[in-house]
């Protein structure tokens, strides 16, 4: 019998039969900016399919990640990873905090993608943290920060091209990384998920928002957009 290890707003982690493996289950829950959790029936199944597909694609281009295989409609088998206490946010277009905090026009295209680090803490509302703080807190080494940034930009470039090929614009995405020990060395590994829950996705021509951004204002249309993204990725 599997044992629950962790329960988040949209995913649950369980123990697996083998050491250093876990089962990650996707729920239908979505979290709003207010902290309220709402249910979007079927979202978990779609996110499992989308994330499995994208992690497989990233593996093909040499991006180490925790995904091993999809077990069923909602669950996947993953590698245990010592997750870093920071999220990596890559943005190529002004959205979210750039509009709220800097007064930028939504949709303004940056010359180059911007990388932000945020503390993985809902309690403290995911504050921005800089590289000097990360080093002083001993969360990552200088080499690890460099490797994470390089991988994050490579992942973002690949995903941007993939989504553009199906008429969807990747505006921003949130990535999580960690380390896996390999003898005396450690490997930097992509973890968590890549889905409409942690990617800002817009229609390429109309800039109509898709995925999690609809949970706030148009929750009745959220499932349709998740389904649209999944269907378009099937074409790849």
Swiss-Prot record:
Q: Reaction catalysed by this chain?
A: 5-amino-1-(5-phospho-D-ribosyl)imidazole-4-carboxylate + L-aspartate + ATP = (2S)-2-[5-amino-1-(5-phospho-beta-D-ribosyl)imidazole-4-carboxamido]succinate + ADP + phosphate + 2 H(+)
Annotated EC: 6.3.2.6
- What biological processes does GO assign it? 'de novo' IMP biosynthetic process; cobalamin biosynthetic process
Q: What Pfam families does the database record attribute to this sequence? A: SAICAR_synt
Tell me which InterPro entries the record gives: SAICAR_synt/ADE2_N, SAICAR_synt_PurC, SAICAR_synthetase
Is this entry keyworded Ligase?
yes
Functional pathway: Purine metabolism; IMP biosynthesis via de novo pathway; 5-amino-1-(5-phospho-D-ribosyl)imidazole-4-carboxamide from 5-amino-1-(5-phospho-D-ribosyl)imidazole-4-carboxylate: step 1/2
- A cellular component annotation (GO) from this entry: cytosol
* Principal EC category: ligase
Answer yes or no on keyword ATP-binding.
yes
GO MF, one example: phosphoribosylaminoimidazolesuccinocarboxamide synthase activity
**Keyword annotations:** ATP-binding, Ligase, Nucleotide-binding, Purine biosynthesis
Entry similarity comment: Belongs to the SAICAR synthetase family.
Q: What is this protein called?
A: Phosphoribosylaminoimidazole-succinocarboxamide synthase
Q: What is the organism of origin for this protein? A: Rickettsia akari (strain Hartford)
